[in-house]
Structures are given as C-alpha cells and as structure tokens.
Amino acid sequence: MRAVMGININATARSLLLSEFVSAFFLAMRYFFQPKPTLNYPFEKGPISPRFRGEHALRRYPNGEERCIACKLCEAVCPAQAITIEAGPRRNDGTRRTVRYDIDMVKCIYCGLCQEACPVDAIVEGPNFEFATETREELFYDKAKLLANGDRWEREIAKAIELDAPYR
C-alpha cells in the first residue's frame, strides 16, 4: 500500500477508474444472459419434499375400508386442538370406526404430530398446498372431505411414505 502525503494511491486509483462498478457490471451481464433460476409459479411447480406437510387426508386400505380405528391419539396430541373425533360403537369383531372426524384447518398449525401419532397411518398431511377458499367455513373439513382427499392423493401419499420410511 503506497501513500503519498497521507493519500492512499491504490484506493484513489480504484475509485477514479471505477473498478468496482466495472466488475459489478460484468457480473450482472454474465447472469443476464444465463437461464433464469426462478420458476413461473402458477404454470411451473417446483419439487416437493416427501416430508412436505400440506392438506390433510384420511387414507383407506386397498380393500376400501377406512384406516382410522378411532383411537383418538391424533386428537390428544394436537397442540392446536383442531381435531374432533367421535367413535362409533364397537363392531362384532371388536374394532371401532369413527362416526365423526373433523379438522378445523384454520386452527391447524401443520406440525405433523397427528400424522406421527397415528398407529395405522390413517391421517396424513398430503402434497396439496393449493387449497385457498373464499370463506372460513370451507376450511372446516369433515370425514367425507378428508376421505375424498385421501382417495385423490393416495398415489402421491403412498410414494411419500415409502420415501420417508428409512427415517421413521
């Protein structure tokens, strides 16, 4: 670093020649002519992790019977108290099924504890993140809506559970 009469010559030369400006300009031009890394969201969708927590769904067994055994573990573990379950009477074989299974999606914090607590993988958070509504009442999911979501997203949900299996 050379200084003449208290003036740093290197810093003065850089500021007079605008070297930072020129290097920034060339850097910007290099990125200007490359393909853009951003996505055109509504038309292009990015990759979703197998652990993504989106819209809730109730799954069925391959024979069509619903998986939920009305153990109410998901209701007990929900920190937001967004899940309400009513169990039906015991059947002849000793099993139970739900009569009512409601999730208030406005209360839900999408923590995934309900999915972790479920012993039969009945309640899952699926890959759907586009479920905006016009009214709050539409975000109150009943059993029929949850089962419809499960039927709609079963292929993607099963694939995500399979990919996540080594980490469970």
Curated annotation (Swiss-Prot):
Its cofactor is [4Fe-4S] cluster. Residues 58-88, 99-128 form the 4Fe-4S ferredoxin-type domain. GO terms for biological process: aerobic respiration. [4Fe-4S] cluster 2 binds at residues 78, 108, 111, 114. It is found in: Cell inner membrane. It catalyses: a quinone + NADH + 5 H(+)(in) = a quinol + NAD(+) + 4 H(+)(out). Its EC number is 7.1.1.-. InterPro entries: 4Fe4S_Fe-S-bd (IPR017896), 4Fe4S_Fe_S_CS (IPR017900), NADH_quinone_OxRdtase_chainI (IPR010226). PROSITE patterns: 4FE4S_FER_1, 4FE4S_FER_2. GO terms for cellular component: plasma membrane. [4Fe-4S] cluster 1 binds at residues 68, 71, 74, 118. Pfam families: Fer4_7. The keyword Calcium does not apply. It comes from the Bacteria. HAMAP family: NDH1_NuoI (MF_01351). NDH-1 is composed of 14 different subunits. Subunits NuoA, H, J, K, L, M, N constitute the membrane sector of the complex. Belongs to the complex I 23 kDa subunit family. This is NADH-quinone oxidoreductase subunit I. It comes from Bradyrhizobium diazoefficiens (strain JCM 10833 / BCRC 13528 / IAM 13628 / NBRC 14792 / USDA 110).
